[in-house]
From Swiss-Prot:
Top-level EC class: lyase
Organism in which the protein naturally occurs: Psychrobacter arcticus (strain DSM 17307 / VKM B-2377 / 273-4)
Binding site for substrate: 261, 290, 319, 355, 375-377, 416-419, 455, 482
Cofactor or coenzyme needed: [4Fe-4S] cluster
Catalytic activity, EC: 4.1.99.17
Name recorded for this polypeptide: Phosphomethylpyrimidine synthase
Alphabetic keyword roster: 4Fe-4S, Iron, Iron-sulfur, Lyase, Metal-binding, S-adenosyl-L-methionine, Thiamine biosynthesis, Zinc
Protein task: Catalyzes the synthesis of the hydroxymethylpyrimidine phosphate (HMP-P) moiety of thiamine from aminoimidazole ribotide (AIR) in a radical S-adenosyl-L-methionine (SAM)-dependent reaction.
Record-stated family: Belongs to the ThiC family.
Amino acid sequence: MTISDIGSQASTTTSSKATAKADALKTPAHRSETDARFEEDARDLHRILPASRKVYIEGSRPDIQVPMREITLDPTPIQGVPESEWEQNPPFYVYDTSGVYTDPNTTIDLTKGLPKLREEWIKERGDTEQLSGLSSDYGQARARDISTANLRFAHIDKPRRAKAVDGKVGNVTQMHYARRGIITPEMEYIAIRETQKQHELTDMRQHEGETFGAHTPAIITPEFVRSEVAAGRAIIPNNINHPESEPMIIGRNFLVKINANIGNSALGSSIDEEVSKMTWATRWGADNIMDLSTGNHIHETREWLIRNSPVPIGTVPIYQALEKVDGVAEDLTWEIFRDTLIEQAEQGVDYFTIHAGVLLRYVPLTANRLTGIVSRGGSIMAQWCLAHHKESFLYTHFEDICEIMKQYDVAFSLGDGLRPGCLQDANDEAQFGELRTLGELTQVAWKHDVQVMIEGPGHVAMNRIKENMDLQLETCADAPFYTLGPLTTDIAPGYDHITSAIGAAMIGWFGTAMLCYVTPKEHLGLPNKKDVKDGIITYKIAAHAADLAKGHPGAQARDNALSKARFEFRWDDQFNLALDPDTAREFHDETLPKDAHKSAHFCSMCGPKFCSMKITQNVRDYAAGLKTLADTKNSVSPQSGALNDAEHLIKKVDTQLVEQVGSASAEEIHQGMAEMTEKYHKEGRQLYKEV
């Protein structure tokens, strides 16, 4: 089945149980049961997480509707009080990247794409024009190619471009507006989104963080967003030809973001699968998507992704340019690359990774490395430089690239083509020489009001990570840093989502603005749906840990809410407040599957007799009883019935405590240990058992 078949199957009006079936997803016959479950789940584009609903916060105008996920919480049980009088817990609001796929009031049709959220904002500024058609040679040729007609996205709008001003190229970047004091709807949207209704939360307590020079106000305002973009400390990646995208911001004074890589290769994957990966990734919290396709139909794949993506899409244009010269790096030219930039900008790519810092003089510095040049883009440009013995056209034509990007508001992601591929190669002169060049290029881009972020490593031991962050801030004048990990050890293939998340949490704390996720398949193979989810959840943990360490305003509120639910044995709320409710619930139900256990005052770790939190609650009740007794003695006569009631309450609680922490508990502990010893010998004295 081809992508053209999706339309009849995916066009549906959403309901709470609706599913938009993109049945063109390919599922290998040999897949495991777990893989099959994840593939099936990924087809259901509309499934929202438990106890959640999509809500919108309106801005200063009716068309600024900022999406959030509202999590409904159960009331707090109060012993001896009717359920109708239990303490009510307000709903909790979290940042939501899933787009309208989880909106029950939206019709999803993948063949038509998402609603054009930003279209009117772009038009009303009056500084863009709609072209008569595609202006890139390759785009025009592709449109005439009948062999790809069945793969083509059917509803392609004519692209927009900045109007010329006084005979010069126009500029429509968010940085251009910000530097002129203009607060755009995108900036207001972001301010609401970043604040996450935190002022309405009940428990905003948190520890003071270590910011390493970052400065974030208690409430994010549109003016603060504007000032950060104007200074170059943050970027808003929003191409005018991707009006479907929901505005977001990348900068160290905002929430740490994560990026998910997808893309086909010559070895496999289809357009259908890439669209499915994108919707799956954004459902679990990917803030950005990079399409790293290198296989067939790169142009068509990208069109489908952009038209259906609620988050910014980034690419590495040199990959497609290389395909146009049949993979021969030496045959690349500025003209081919320029045409590729225009082609992708007119499709709506929000940011380009461009390895303009790979200079001829840096290439020999990699000769003594253990793993040489590991960046695909870096190796392509290094080979070109050596073949022609001159600086790459990415470097010599950098200002020409800026002229293109400011007409569409495409942001730079200046690539680290000489990043280290192992711990041994970290922080060498090749890596840091390129970083200093990226700092110089940042100033050139800012001269054109083009937004910039800087890519970073890689593989770096923990004790050497901060040196990377400090040098980046110094040489790149606080431009946002965007890193792959870094991996903190090289000995754990299959677990590199963990080795890299350790480094990601650290460098995020030190000031990195966006973390590129790593899946368990890193260095081993192409990730499936489960790998994508595992990578995203792992990196959401790292990003959140960094926000906590920085003391980002409101960052700890979700931790407080979940901890309160845990202490009060509100099991469903614990699951629903988690980053991955499905897995939390699944693990709990493996040992305590009954519905009654969802309200039990214990878990399978300690059991009903030895739950530390239940004992603590009893201690609190005991203390409260003592206070009630003391207060009653001080306020009523000895003959009062209230005094008898208070004494009865304290005796009851006292008895409960003795049962749990006194001699009875000790006897039960010894009896339980004896029973488990007997069971251990009876079952063959095996440390581990097959399950």
